[in-house]
Amino acid sequence: MATKSKRTLAIRAMVDRNNRYAIEEALELVKKMATTKFDESVDVAVGLGIDPRKSDQVVRGAVVLPHGTGKQMRVAVFATADKATEAREAGADIVGMEDLAELVKAGQMDFDVVIATPDAMRVVGTLGPVLGPRGLMPNPKVGTVTADVRTAVINAKGGQVRYRADKGGIVHSTIGKSSFEVKALQENLLVLIDSLRKAKPATSKGIYIRKVNLSPTMGPGVAVDLSGLG
């Protein structure tokens, strides 16, 4: 316990809470703070100028990061016939319909993403109470309800992140692993920020991107100087 406390104190001492760091400097600091034995994720929290209580200010979307997330994603697809074949050929880990639904109901959900063809939603719709709380329910707004299952599977396997602003107007995501080069993390971050800007609600007024904090899985946040976001 004492060792953990010393580590925590040492890491916190690296960060000047009153400073806003340039992107590269912030990422270098995050990598330096990732001192655990596993390859920590580099997480980002983006504070948006929205009112999440208003239905017309919901920010939700998905974007493929150019350098991926560093995580191997397992993908399940609800589809039949040719679409099921497309999904398998694209690399889906599990493909089915009623049989897959039975696995979900039994709690056997060894996957990170669920994709469904529009006609499969008659089956998937009944699984809302199970998939919804786990953030696995397919949704057309993030491209997981689609007839183009091939592209959806390739994107999910290739580093796509899905995001949604929480009740505080903050979007939480990951932009890679601490083992990534700073340049790769920076490019991933800028692609995510660009996607968030494109998702800006028309009714959002004032400053939209209000704050950006970066952190390793087991470390404190580092505030980013917004002027470097382009």
Swiss-Prot record:
GO terms for biological process: regulation of translation; translation. GO terms for molecular function: rRNA binding; structural constituent of ribosome; tRNA binding. Pfam families: Ribosomal_L1 (PF00687). Keywords: Repressor, Ribonucleoprotein, Ribosomal protein, RNA-binding, rRNA-binding, Translation regulation, tRNA-binding. InterPro entries: Ribosom_uL1_bac-type (IPR005878), Ribosomal_uL1 (IPR002143), Ribosomal_uL1-like (IPR023674), Ribosomal_uL1/biogenesis (IPR028364), Ribosomal_uL1_3-a/b-sand (IPR016095), Ribosomal_uL1_CS (IPR023673). One of its GO terms (cellular component) is cytosolic large ribosomal subunit. Belongs to the universal ribosomal protein uL1 family. Part of the 50S ribosomal subunit. Binds directly to 23S rRNA. The L1 stalk is quite mobile in the ribosome, and is involved in E site tRNA release. Protein L1 is also a translational repressor protein, it controls the translation of the L11 operon by binding to its mRNA. This is Large ribosomal subunit protein uL1. The gene is rplA.
